[in-house]
Amino acid sequence: MRAFVDESSCLRTASTQEYLIGAAIVSTEDCDAVREELRPLRLPGQIKPHWTDESASRRRSITRAISELGSMHVVVAHLSGRNRKTERYRRKCLETLYYELAAADVLDITLERRSDSQDKKDRAHIVALQNQGWNPHLRITHCRGGDDPLLWIPDAVLGAVNASYTGEHEYLDLLRDTILIEKRTPESLEPDSRQNERP
């Protein structure tokens, strides 16, 4: 089994924000076939489908296609006060994700590429965790989103999660049965019952 990982960060209230990490889990032998099923989702001229750039009808098409792929998904969230610096929240989410994936024997993890310096921090982070006794077989690589269609899956899953907070539940409803694990980091704030929390 392999995991393909993307991130998202959104405001939740006037004073809080949420950092999310999403992973699509795909069996190794199915990866190429799933990539071929996803490729038609890329429009002419697009580098990749990207949730924030898509229309409502396109979002429906994308989530419907993903719901039929057979991939399973993990979503990890960290709710905090508003802060422009999110690398610490990313590390906390990745720690929870790595723990859950290792427990499921998913050790081959592809993260969407960011900048060289940010990717270097990801690699240093996993080395530090392994030096503390974490599973030594966990392996991360980075890849540009346009180069691997499997990275389009977590982008859409996190997009659907974020849309649900603004009352657009139809996308997440299509994907609900594919979300295997949904966790908050140990240091995450709990959602305020007064905010528009999704069901």
What are these regions (language model features)?
Residues M1-P199:
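Phosphate-ester processing/binding pockets and catalytic centers
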